[in-house]
């Protein structure tokens, strides 16, 4: 009787844990960008945040959604991509408005010019939306034509998670080039590391496609490498640290 009562209690507890993990998976990825968004709004200065972070995450999550049509995976991972896309669009909108307001003599640059020198440096948020829609349309059409190819679908999934996994590499390279982590927020990197570790464990425990687990592990390794740089360059400085960058740019460049 006691065992039955305990079992009755454990079933809803297991469901609550599952729902909590799914919720953390869906919304956890955007948490680091909330203080960054608030900081940009408060200071009206977006120089410390690279909009290329938005580009990488938009491409990665659009490809992940397209991958879902070829091979269904956990619903929380699909909703995570939707939430991240909306978050990055909000970040782009704010950054564009702030930059245009601060640059009085800004020459208007539009997506329809197709000028590679000004790519992702346009004057209006609408141009970024046009670019995202164009990429989604082209990638979606190619996926529609190739959806029956298992090789294409698996490659699409790999490209999606590999793109996201490479997000920390520019920071890793910047630290190595300057032989310093001055201006980089250690708290942010720790947050990325814990988030990527949780995400990878979620992939492994829920039987997500292999690409997700492999690239999740790669993300964790990149995060740990950045933390290793912070330890080495702080403990054994090789040269005077360069001018401090804005903490919000930690994973941007």
Swiss-Prot record:
Residue ranges annotated for the PQ-loop domain, each copy included: 14-80, 160-215
Top-level division of the source organism's lineage: Eukaryota
Transmembrane as UniProt keyword: yes
Any single biological process term in GO: phospholipid translocation
Primary residence: membrane
Topological type in the membrane: Multi-pass membrane protein
A Pfam cross-reference name: PQ-loop
Transmembrane segments: 7-27, 49-69, 72-92, 125-145, 150-170, 214-234
Keywords attached to this entry: Membrane, Repeat, Transmembrane, Transmembrane helix
Compartments (UniProt record): Membrane
GO cellular component terms, A-Z: cytosol; endosome; membrane; trans-Golgi network
PANTHER family: PQ-LOOP REPEAT-CONTAINING PROTEIN 1-LIKE PROTEIN, SOLUTE CARRIER FAMILY 66 MEMBER 2
Protein name in the entry: Solute carrier family 66 member 2
Organism: Bos taurus
Gene transcribed to yield this protein: SLC66A2
